Amino acid sequence: YYPMQNTIIKNWFPAGERGRANTAWILGQSLAPALAMPLYTWIIAEHSWRHTFYFSFSLTLLPIVLIYFFTSNFPQENKYVNVLELQKINKSTTEEVLHKNSSEKISVVERAKVYLCNSNFWILLAVFSSNSMLSWGVVTWLPTYLNTERGFSWANVGWMSALPFIFGLLFKVLAGFIVDKTDRKGMVMFVSAMLCAASILTGVNISNNFFAAIVISFGIGASSMQLPCVFTLLQSMVPAEAMSSAAGALNGMAVGFGALSPVLIGFILSVTHNFYFVMYILIGIVVIGGLFSLLFSRDRSRLLN
């Protein structure tokens, strides 16, 4: 998924449009969970749980058809791209290549060296991992927090758990436009982290349960501003030939750290029985990621070094 996303956007979009392109691609990560909960509940109630699988299978056919018939590896290979569009893409995009001879086969090791030996890749991994740890922790434990600590019924927890994804959708759209307009990816990621941390900190200390849930959800949604920036930065620092493997490595390692988050939260709860302590740890992780983001706001010319 992420290797394909980053490769297509790297090859098809000028640098000044990649923020919006990445946003458009990943909007489904916020839109789908927000819609899936009530929709799948209705399908199960009206039909059966098996029908959710039939419905999911039907949905996957649409992108398969669109990708197979209307896209290609490069815009030069696509019959639907006209000359003016092709000129705009080629003029606005600076292509970095590993070899001048395009027929020469590039080894896996050589591709990996391009990003693994780039310090910016590891800084970006730190930012993405902090975001992933927040996301996985929230998806796993937010419903329990709202039920046990805030006293919401499970019926109310259902729609409240969708709030972070709704806010996330709005913040992703905003980030995509800001990134393409200003090219300040590092600063956008930093502001996103600070807004997230401040909102969660405020939310856990608000006595009104309803407003607390909204403020916490707002903060979690604000963290979504980092995602278009992460992928746009990756596409700026890695040549097209290594894009797919770099995206896979970045996402794979970030998901690995993210998967530790629910386990870490569960362990802390078993020892402290204190959800506030868990929230403060998540806030700390987000702030650390935000501080790493500042390194990208210092000097944008160092991305390809």
Enumerate the predicted regions with their spans:
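Cytoplasmic helix-loop-helix junction between adjacent transmembrane helices
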Residues: 1-28
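Helix-to-loop junctions at the C-terminal end of transmembrane segments
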Residues: 171-183, 269
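A late C-terminal transmembrane helix in Major Facilitator Superfamily
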Residues: 235-274
